[in-house]
Structures are given as C-alpha cells and as structure tokens.
C-alpha cells in the first residue's frame, strides 16, 4: 500500500528575538494540533536556520524557498513588517498567480505535474497588532498604526487576513 504524503504548510514571520521565536514555536504547536494532517514547516525549527552552524544567505534562502514552493498552506505574521516575510509572501503569491495565468493550458498532463510540484497555496496573513481596530478613529499624525498597503494588497489579492492567530484555525477548516 502506497503511503500518502501529507501536504506541506509554511509558517512565516519574524525570528529575531526571544518573543518572536516563542510566538513562532507557539504557532507551530497550534497548527500541528489544528491540522495534524499537514506537515508544518517552521523555519525557526529547521536545521538550515540554526545560526550556530553558520548557514550562508544562499543556504537559508533556498532551504526556506524550497519549502514555500512545495507548500499548500502559507501562514504569515504581518504585524511587524519583516523583509523576509514580505519576500516569502511574494513567492507564495507568485505561485498562485502562475496557476491562474496558466489555467487555460490545454496540456492537462503538464498542468497536473505543475500543480503537484508547486501547489496552489491557501494564504492567511495574521495582523494582530492591538492598535489596528481603532486606527481609523484617529487623524493626522496621531494614527497609531499603519501597514504597507502593497504588502496587505498582495495578501488580500489571493488570501485572507485575520486579527488573531486563533482565527487561523477556522480558515484552515474551510476547503
């Protein structure tokens, strides 16, 4: 009997201080609990990102990018704009864009192979900053929060944005 391979999920977000590392680890544990049928890749847990082994920029880029390309789920912390997270989101968005672009391809065999190698991603952005709900009530320079609209637009173009990580669970249950 052939063993079915689990789909891959990717967890994107800042990884540069103790609080961010703790948050990524918490997210990984929750995602594995909510969707045990998915193999969740969490860069902070990956050997390629172990700074004691002195990985090169290329090692990190390709180690993580290969996982993004193969993932079916892409969950990103958008709260503190991180260049790495934005770049990862761009890769995930581009794969989905290419699927749409080539949707009219007549060659179904090639199409199936592309989908298997680079699956369409369910993209979910988490924008959990506590200032977001009231940001529109302020004026001028007193607006307490802003997000890069290009980054937000890319996520909303092909995904969803939630304001609490707990809301991700409900979206993951939707097919």
Label every PLM stretch briefly.
Residues 1-175:
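Conserved catalytic or regulatory cores that recognize and/or transform ribose-phosphate-containing ligands
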């Amino acid at each position: 009997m052939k063993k079915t391979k689990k789909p891959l999920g990717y967890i994107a977000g800042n990884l540069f201080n103790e609080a961010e590392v703790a948050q990524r680890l918490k997210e990984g544990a929750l995602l594995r609990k909510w969707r045990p049928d998915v193999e969740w890749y969490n860069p902070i847990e990956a050997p390629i990102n172990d700074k004691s082994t002195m990985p090169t920029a290329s090692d990190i880029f390709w180690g993580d990018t290969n996982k993004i390309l193969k993932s079916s789920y892409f969950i990103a912390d958008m709260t503190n704009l991180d260049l790495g997270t934005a770049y990862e989101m761009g890769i995930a968005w581009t794969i989905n864009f290419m699927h749409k672009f080539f949707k009219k391809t007549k060659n179904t065999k090639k199409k199936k192979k592309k989908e298997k190698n680079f699956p369409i991603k369910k993209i979910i952005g988490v924008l959990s900053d506590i200032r977001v709900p009231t940001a529109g009530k302020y004026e001028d320079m007193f607006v307490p929060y802003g997000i890069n609209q290009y980054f937000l637009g890319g996520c909303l173009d092909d995904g969803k944005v939630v304001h609490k990580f707990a809301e991700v669970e409900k979206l993951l249950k939707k097919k």
